[in-house]
């Protein structure tokens, strides 16, 4: 008999020879049709068909958990691979991972050996996938030696699989299959193909094998999968709605920003976009001031010795830009924290002045492959709303709780009301002591629990220097965006020998907290554009008011109104072009101005304004002072 301990600490006994599926059907029947895999002791993830072989803490993974979701999507990638090879007998499969960001949730890179495949072929491939689902094949697993695996895939002409096997350090590999078809995979997978009922192929592109342009060009097919048609339909609606809201399209229409061939991945902010950018920065700056943050600025270019000292050289080298100055190596900063730590180290510190909260709108540069650049969402230069807090260890929990409150205050200001929060734990490639990681992770959990905030766990997805809280905001069409983070860092204070003098006169090491709320201003602005569909609330809108003249006779009156609104602190544009008023209105609607003032002779004679709110066709006649008062009230209440 074996003992399995559930998350609620209850212990269940399992007979020898039972599979995890048997266990769930007997002890947790309400999960029978939802279970996709199990996780043992917070680490090992297994198929339901595996036999129980030891005492363990067990979690049942469903689609609603990230690891269950990943299992589902990866199984759908296998479904795609099987369908493709059923239809294209010479096709060679390479890799089919799950992805968080992209035109799908999974993809498979395929060498079609000369066959041309386009989106027009998707219905045919999807029909074959449907057949496999209806057949409801049990998913089987087999462990073989590397030698056996190589011989098997050699017979099939699968050269990419052989190359992958050669790079696997262990002497055994696992193979997963459905019916007679199989693929190299470490798993886990769903129990049977019939579970994968609702899917859609979403995009196609080219990709080099191993992202090396000297290797073969492959065809990358993307897809998504859901447990139900309702969820798939909802997702497809989101995609169609997202196309209308694409920040690249709206940004061009509103003349907010552009990208130039002279600087791919480097945003150019136009006057209207700069207004928006500055509005976000000024708001957060004012909120930081209320909370005792001190703003700093650090250099963009710093010695490579600094990056070696901080650990970024070893952990981030491939994403950095380098230059030579006076025959020494320098780098554009990919992160702001080392420079901030130099400022901390510049002075002696007493426990009386801690916690010390530094804030920086720091511009950073990170090298991204050209193929992954995507508007403001994936760029090579961006500005982080960074904060670095240095505190005694016993202040860690209270500081984290204050940051949690701060973060939600900011998000609610922008109209976000639904959130998902995660704790990302220690990755394989990390620095620091085990006890520090355990303490920091425990503190993050306790902070969220005391605030009554539910959270999920992202195993192994923390930063190399410490665990973190990730804040995800849900936008107006139901998409989740990961934005803010709170990261605990014991490593950098150690590396930079940071200290403070405690009440007993002894030197102590502070803990360092990295905090960002927007994440990056560029990406957050992209999210806001799509969330609001460019229809920004008045307080941040770059196009608050547009004044449109009906005839030339009212030009002087319009200029007088324009000057009064400018003097009152509003963002206003004056359109006195010799165009029909209908054309001017259409242009203003495209610019998504909050208010249109349509001024004709009647308004001039009565010293009033014909006001049209965004999204409405009716106009209201207001006095000039009444309109200004309304605007001021609207901004105050936002």
From Swiss-Prot:
Keywords: Aminoacyl-tRNA synthetase, ATP-binding, Cytoplasm, Ligase, Metal-binding, Nucleotide-binding, Protein biosynthesis, RNA-binding, tRNA-binding, Zinc. Homodimer. Binds 1 zinc ion per subunit. Residues 246-537 are annotated as: Catalytic. Belongs to the class-II aminoacyl-tRNA synthetase family. Catalyzes the attachment of threonine to tRNA(Thr) in a two-step reaction: L-threonine is first activated by ATP to form Thr-AMP and then transferred to the acceptor end of tRNA(Thr). Also edits incorrectly charged L-seryl-tRNA(Thr). Gene3D superfamilies: 3.10.20.30, 3.30.54.20, Anticodon-binding domain (3.40.50.800), Bira Bifunctional Protein, Domain 2 (3.30.930.10), Threonyl-trna Synthetase, Chain A, domain 2 (3.30.980.10). Residues 1-62 form the TGS domain. CDD domains: TGS_ThrRS (cd01667), ThrRS_anticodon (cd00860), ThrRS_core (cd00771). GO terms for molecular function: ATP binding; metal ion binding; threonine-tRNA ligase activity; tRNA binding. The keyword Nucleotide-binding applies. The lineage of its organism: Bacteria, Pseudomonadati, Spirochaetota, Spirochaetia, Leptospirales. Its cofactor is Zn(2+). InterPro entries: aa-tRNA-synt_IIb, aa-tRNA-synth_II, aa-tRNA-synth_II/BPL/LPL, Anticodon-bd, Anticodon-bd_dom_sf, Beta-grasp_dom_sf, TGS, TGS-like. This is Threonine--tRNA ligase. It comes from Leptospira interrogans serogroup Icterohaemorrhagiae serovar Lai (strain 56601). It is found in: Cytoplasm. Zn(2+) binds at residues 337, 388, 514.
């Amino acid at each position: 008999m074996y003992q399995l301990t559930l998350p609620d600490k209850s212990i269940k006994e399992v007979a020898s020879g039972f599979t995890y599926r048997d266990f769930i059907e007997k002890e947790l029947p309400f999960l029978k049709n939802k279970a996709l895999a199990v996780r043992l002791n917070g680490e090992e993830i297994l198929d339901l068909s595996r036999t129980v072989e030891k005492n363990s803490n067990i979690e049942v993974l469903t689609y609603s958990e990230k690891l269950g979701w990943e299992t589902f999507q990866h199984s759908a990638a296998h479904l795609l691979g099987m369908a493709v090879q059923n239809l294209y007998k010479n096709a060679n499969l390479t890799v089919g991972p799950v992805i968080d960001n992209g035109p799908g949730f999974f993809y498979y890179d395929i060498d079609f050996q000369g066959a041309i495949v386009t989106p027009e072929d998707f219905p045919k491939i999807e029909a074959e996938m449907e057949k496999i689902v209806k057949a409801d094949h049990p998913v089987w697993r087999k462990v073989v030696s590397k030698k056996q695996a190589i011989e098997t895939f050699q017979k099939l002409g699968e050269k990419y699989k052989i190359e992958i096997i050669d790079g696997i350090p262990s002497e055994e590999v696992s193979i997963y299959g459905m019916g007679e078809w199989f693929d190299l995979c470490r798993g886990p997978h769903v129990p049977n193909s019939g579970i994968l009922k609702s899917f859609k192929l979403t995009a196609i592109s080219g990709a080099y094998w191993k992202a090396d342009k000297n290797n073969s060009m492959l065809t990358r097919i993307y897809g998504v999968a859901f447990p139900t048609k309702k969820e798939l339909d909802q997702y497809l609606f989101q995609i169609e709605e997202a196309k209308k809201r694409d920040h690249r399209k709206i940004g061009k229409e509103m003349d907010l920003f552009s990208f130039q061939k002279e600087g791919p991945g480097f945003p150019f902010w136009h006057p209207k976009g700069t207004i928006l950018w500055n509005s976000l920065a000024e708001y957060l700056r004012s909120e930081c001031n209320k909370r005792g943050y001190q703003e700093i600025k650090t250099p963009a270019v710093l010695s490579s010795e600094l990056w070696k000292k901080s650990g970024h050289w070893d952990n981030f080298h491939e994403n950095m830009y380098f230059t030579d100055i006076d025959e020494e190596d320098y780098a554009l900063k990919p992160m702001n924290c080392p420079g901030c730590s130099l400022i901390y180290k510049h002075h002696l510190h007493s426990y009386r002045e801690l916690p010390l909260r530094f804030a920086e709108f720091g511009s950073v540069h990170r090298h991204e492959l050209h193929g992954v650049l995507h508007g403001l969402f994936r760029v090579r230069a961006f500005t982080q709303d960074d904060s670095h807090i240095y505190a005694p260890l016993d202040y860690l929990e209270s500081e984290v709780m204050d940051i949690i409150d701060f973060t939600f205050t900011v998000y609610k200001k922008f109209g976000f009301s639904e959130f998902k929060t995660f704790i990302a734990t220690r990755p394989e490639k990390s620095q620091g002591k085990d006890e520090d990681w355990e303490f920091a992770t425990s503190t993050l959990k306790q902070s969220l629990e005391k605030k009554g905030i539910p959270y999920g766990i992202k195993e192994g997805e923390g930063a190399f220097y410490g665990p973190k809280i990730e804040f995800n905001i849900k936008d107006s069409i139901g998409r989740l965006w990961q934005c803010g983070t709170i990261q605990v860092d014991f490593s950098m204070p150690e590396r930079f020998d940071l200290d403070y003098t405690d009440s007993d006169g002894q030197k102590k090491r502070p803990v360092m907290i990295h905090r960002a709320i927007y994440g990056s201003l560029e990406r957050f602005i992209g999210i806001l554009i799509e969330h609001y569909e460019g229809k920004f609330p008045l307080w941040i809108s770059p196009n608050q008011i547009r004044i449109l003249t009906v005839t030339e006779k009212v030009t002087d009156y319009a200029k007088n109104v324009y000057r009064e609104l400018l003097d009152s602190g509003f963002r206003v544009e004056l359109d006195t072009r010799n165009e029909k008023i209908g054309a001017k209105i259409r242009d203003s609607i495209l610019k998504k101005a909050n208010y249109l003032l349509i001024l004709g002779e009647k308004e001039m004679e009565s010293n009033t304004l014909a006001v049209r709110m965004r999204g409405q066709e009716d106009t209201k006649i207001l006095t000039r002072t009444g309109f200004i008062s309304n605007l001021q009230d609207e901004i105050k209440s936002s």
